[in-house]
Structures are given as C-alpha cells and as structure tokens.
Amino acid sequence: MKALHFGAGNIGRGFIGYLLYKSNYETTFVDIFDKVVDDINKYKRYTVITLSTSKNKEKVENVRAVNLKDSVALEKEVLEADLITTSLGLNNLKSTGELLRGFLKKRSEINDKPLDIIACENALFASDVLKKAILDGADEELKKYLEKSVGFPNCTVDRIVPNVDIEKELPIDVAVEDFYEWDIEKNKVKINNKIIGAEYVEKLDPYLERKLFLLNGAHATIAYLGYLKGYKYIHEAIKDKEINKIIVGFHSEAVQALSEKHKIDIQILKEYSNKLLKRFENEYLKDDVSRVGRDPMRKLSSNDRLITPLKLCCDLKIDFTNILFGVASGYLFNYKEDEKAQGIQNIITKEGIKKAISNVSQIKEGDYLNNMIAYKYEELKKQN
C-alpha cells in the first residue's frame, strides 16, 4: 500500500508517518521546504524518540519525499496512492484541495482505484473542509468519481510533538511523547481500515470535541497563563498552583458540557481528563509555552479549542469561569515573535478588546460573551 502525506513536519514524521510505517505503508512525504525534502531523500529513514522516564527509539524506514513545487512528481504520487493524509494546518487545506483537484481529475480518467483522503489536523471535521475545497470547481465527472471511489473520513489526532532540543543522529529524527491517539470515521473509509494504532469509530463527534476541549483547549490555556506568569515550559506552568486550579476547573466545566451534549458517562471523561493532566506534567517533553500558544488568531477563532467549549457551556447554562480564563489570557498573549499574536495586539491597540473579540472570535460587540471575555481580559491585564 502506498501513502502520500502532505506536511513532513514533526507531526507528519513523528505521528502519522510513524504509524503508517508500522502498518507497512510505503510513505512519500510532500513538503515545501527543500532542506526537509532533501534530507528525507538522502537518508530514506529517521528515528522517532519517545520522551518519558525511559527514552525509546524506533526506526522509520522506506520513506522518501517530493517537493510541493514539483508538479510532475506530485502528480505521479497522487495517481499511485492508496491513501493521502495531511498535517499542514487547517489554513492550508483550501490550497491543498485546489492542488489535489487537478491530480484527482487525471486519476479519474486513468482508473477508479479506491482511495482515502484523511486530513489529520487539530480542527473539527478537517477532512470535510478538504473535500469541499476539492469539490469547489470540480466538474460533474470528477464529482461522480469522488463519490464512488474516494473516502474522506474525518479523524481526531493526538500526540504532543514538541520542538525539544535532543541529541539526534539525523536532522530529521523527531522526539514525541509516549501517548498517541488516532480516531477515524469508520463508515467513510474505502480501503484503509487496518492502520495499526488507529481506532475506527462509528460516531466521531464525541471524540473530536473531547480532544479539542480537554487537550487542545486546556493546553492552550496553560500556555497563555504560563506566558503571563513568565514560565518557559508547559510542565512548569501546570505545576503553578493557581494555573493548575484553573486547568482542573476548565476540565470540570468542559467534562460536564461534553457529558450532557454527547450522553457520555461522566466517569469515563474524568478518567480521560486525569490522563491528560499527567501528560501536561511530562517534564521530558520540555514543551515551550510559545509553541503551544502559537497562532492565537486561529486558536481563538469561533470553531476552535477555546470559543467552542465556552459557547457550549453558555448554551447549556454550565459555569464557564475557568474556560473564560483561557480565552481572555489568549488575548493577552503578546509573544513578539508570533506574527498572529502581534496581529491581535494591533487590533486591540487600534480598536479595543471588544472589537478584537468580534473580529477574531466572531462574537459581536454587545453580546453577553463578548462582554464577559472583555471584562476578564481587563481583570487579567491589571494583574499582570
């Protein structure tokens, strides 16, 4: 089986590529950075180093790469692939879909061999986003081919892959935490139903929101509060008593909302929550708060990790005091080397916090939640 993975970064190599190798796929990475592409083609292997109390090293072999700009090589890979996956950020799915559209049109004219396309992004229903980008502008013949031969299962992906400074044999070796989870929509898969380490589930919604709220939302909150208190790493910030109390409260609020919405046993959610809190404390990861907090413009958007649980709690009349800390602290994330963070700060400086909340989180000025976020923002600002 042949796999084509867009995005040869740490997640691509250390998580998706790692599991595809364990499942006996011949994997080709696609990336825009010449150095990464050249290194993968030079070494044709890399090591995945697991960071925990004992370091474990596993080789990933039989890999190669093509440059995103090499349309001839890329077309050949799309024509031959049994599976296409991505880990390049939600914002890049539209352009990726537009690129794939032409290659899939060519493939449809040659054969109707089944294919699965899975967007492995930190977002809700990312494969649907990619599918829409491909369908927009597709002719009727291509639409029929996609309906018949191509599966677009949504998924959740969960593995912390920090930019930690470790001793490497090769520049493309990658360090990861020892936990991972990949949940895939079972009923939309065409042929790739035996990926080792992946769980195929009937209903994905609870898994998506559980992960988005309890991992991504809480993780970002630790980063933003940790930044305000001057911590460098996540494991340091979560040990701060005040931050820890907020994160435990964040989880408690989100767990209640998830249980009520999806009818999940609250005890199962609490067990998942406890596992996550231990993962956040993993000092071997040395996960920088600036990395975890990166791109608050996206993380504070209306359908992402902080605003979604906030709105759900509000709708269900569940207390959201601690989730509010996460949102407000995100608007105070003023990391100078983060272009998106500076973009938010510029809006706040020129037009005020309420306008920034309206622009970034799509919560209108005058709305109850806009006022609540703005109030908490001003409160935190005075304290820091």
Swiss-Prot record:
SUPFAM superfamilies assigned: 6-phosphogluconate dehydrogenase C-terminal domain-like, NAD(P)-binding Rossmann-fold domains
Alphabetical list of Pfam families matching this protein: Mannitol_dh, Mannitol_dh_C
Gene3D superfamilies on file: N-(1-d-carboxylethyl)-l-norvaline Dehydrogenase, domain 2, NAD(P)-binding Rossmann-like Domain
Species classification: Bacteria, Bacillati, Bacillota, Clostridia, Eubacteriales
Keywords associated with the record: NAD, Oxidoreductase
NCBIfam families, per database record: PRK02318.2-5, PRK02318.2-6
Family: Belongs to the mannitol dehydrogenase family.
EC numbers, comma separated: 1.1.1.17
Annotated protein name in UniProt: Mannitol-1-phosphate 5-dehydrogenase
One record GO biological process: mannitol catabolic process
GO terms under cellular component: cytosol
HAMAP family to which the protein is assigned, alphabetical: Mannitol_dehydrog
Single GO term (MF): mannitol-1-phosphate 5-dehydrogenase activity
Amino acids binding NAD(+): 3-14
Reactions listed under catalytic activity: D-mannitol 1-phosphate + NAD(+) = beta-D-fructose 6-phosphate + NADH + H(+)
Lineage top rank: taxon: Bacteria
